[in-house]
Amino acid sequence: MNHQNLLVELFVEELPPKALQKLGDAFAGVLLEQLQAQGLTSAHSQLTAFASPRRLAAHITEVLPAAADKAVSQKLMPVAVGLDASGQPTPALLKKLTALGADAASVPQLKRVHDGKAEVLFFESMAKGALLADGLQKALDEAIAKLPIPKVMRYQLQDGWTSVHFVRPAHGLVALHGTQVLVGVQALGLTAGNTTHGHRFEASVDPVVIQSADSYAEQLRSEGAVIASFAERRAEIARQLQAAADRVGGGVRPIEDAALLDEVTALVERPNVLVCEFEKEFLAVPQECLILTMKANQKYFPLLDAEGKLTHQFLVVSNISPQDASAVIQGNERVVRPRLADAKFFFDQDRKKTLVSRVDQLAKVVYHNKLGTQGERVERVRHIAKAIATQLFTALAQGNAALDSQEGEIAQDYLLTCVDNAALLAKTDLVTDMVGEFPELQGIMGGYYAVSDGLPDEVAHAIEDHYKPRFAGDALPRENVGVVVALADKLETLVGMFGIGNLPTGDRDPFALRRHALGVIRMLVEKELPLDLDALLASAVPAFGDKIEDTSAQLADFIYDRLAGSLREQGYSAQEVDAVIALRPQRLALVPRQLEAVRAFTQLEEAPALAAANKRVTNILKKAGEVDPHVNEELLQEPAEKDLYAALQRFVPEANAQFDSGDYTASLQTLAVLRAPVDAFFDDVMVNAEELALRLNRQGLLKKLHMAMNRVADLSRLAV
């Protein structure tokens, strides 16, 4: 059959920009999927999706005008039911054949197949392959029905009676197979043709008559002034943004924001980047405020200098390309000025009150109906932060003479004071005008206002950083004060929400508990904090009084699950991760070293045998119940058990010393020499001896072995 390329376009009013790319991919993807299912494409068919503010389209190569005829075998009924004793068709069989468009003359051609215990009749026929127009109609209906439409509109067709539900009113449908219009294809009250429309203002031809499926993109570009491909349009905008920054000079660069670039790509059909500017006096306002208002409200790209500082210039992606762009530039500069003036006003007004003076206002801000106000939350965070700071300082002071002295006490008092001040003031920017207008700036504005109030840098940084990390890959708090307050804030959220039963379910996580858990993990691991997880959770629960249930064990499971998932994403195998997490390590900061030790151990020749033996030991001890690891040498009878005991006495102290010093790799490698005595023990010694004293002694020997082997990880989890 003659393959031709297929083009389908749905021409609509301006689509929601944040949903455009998803809509375009879904529309084209379902069309291809449905045509493939009907046998209308080849094995080499390729899909190109198009999506612009006013169109969704798909170009599919090697599409057949009709699907090939297909042999169909339909199960009818058992022979005993369909044929009588003389081999004549029964009324039941004749009725079934009539329903299939056949008659008694077809009975001799029926196929008999053994199906289980009975012989069954099958009717074989050739099904006519679907015509492309019919197949496309089905595919188009399915593609429209499956579009991930964020919000549906209802509108009437020109007849004034028929209502249509779609994301935006549709005004045109193109369906071309090669150069031929697929007659009869319809969608949303429209009949397919070969005409579409280009740019609202700059098309040189309107309507644009598409000559063939393959000329679609080029004709829209040359005649319609439209770049139909989302990806090509995005790349063109990125190119123009950089070119405009280069023209400005001085090493400036446009801010990098993939989401903003996607949104702007969905707003224009023919991008034209222009350089605009605002008064330099606005640069006295924190740049985060100016950047956010330009990006969120105006979809502008601020220009940053080589040091990442905001300049007074910005880039606008216009949808028109006039010969004289001065009016467009002036219009955008005029529009942004009031936005920046508002930000300056908020900043100036907010600084008239100190953060301390705003603390009482938090008592009027509801946090959660079961957990009270933001004021109550602040007191909980202070309680938790003090406990964490004390634990941290105590851990750091161990073995550190400088901290375990009078100077150390002064340092501890300063740390506790800074932590308490930061925890007290961390949420006060929630009641400022700036954060009320731009919630995304919470924490950031608190840091600026803390500097304005003359607070120590550690406190200002902690207030700014206490929400970090906000997302995957985000920076962590800079100093210990910020780390402590950030940990306290996240633990308050986790313990509180778990305590009232607000747990993540499936895709729903309204309180971002997964993100909070990963934040706790990242800080503990990447900052190498000498803090125990159970101690952290235990310090947080009392802060809630009787408002919550103590769900520390459940929350710990949740955190270990998040940790395991994160480690697998970092490239560790499921077995390696499982072996370490099975021990529920308290110091998460040590987990990376444990994993590296396990990975090195698995490369040893002795590893498989020791892992298998460890699994066997685990099962024996599990059945034995409580086992005393004490070994009575006088009860050791067999040479193999004496050799194992001697090996443990010789190598375990060395392995333990290496473990205690943090050299987990060396510890496991030292224990690898136990392979031979362990193998010999299981070959030659009956563990469950009839004599009780002998049995308990051998179980104790295995317990001693088990304790020595599984300090770094549960090696039984490595057994294949």
From Swiss-Prot:
GO terms for biological process: arginyl-tRNA aminoacylation; glycyl-tRNA aminoacylation. It catalyses: tRNA(Gly) + glycine + ATP = glycyl-tRNA(Gly) + AMP + diphosphate. It is found in: Cytoplasm. Its EC number is 6.1.1.14. Its main location: cytoplasm. Keywords: Aminoacyl-tRNA synthetase, ATP-binding, Cytoplasm, Ligase, Nucleotide-binding, Protein biosynthesis. GO terms for cellular component: cytosol. It holds the Pfam family DALR_1. Tetramer of two alpha and two beta subunits. PANTHER family: GLYCINE--TRNA LIGASE, CHLOROPLASTIC_MITOCHONDRIAL 2, GLYCYL-TRNA SYNTHETASE. Belongs to the class-II aminoacyl-tRNA synthetase family. This is Glycine--tRNA ligase beta subunit. It comes from Acidovorax sp. (strain JS42).
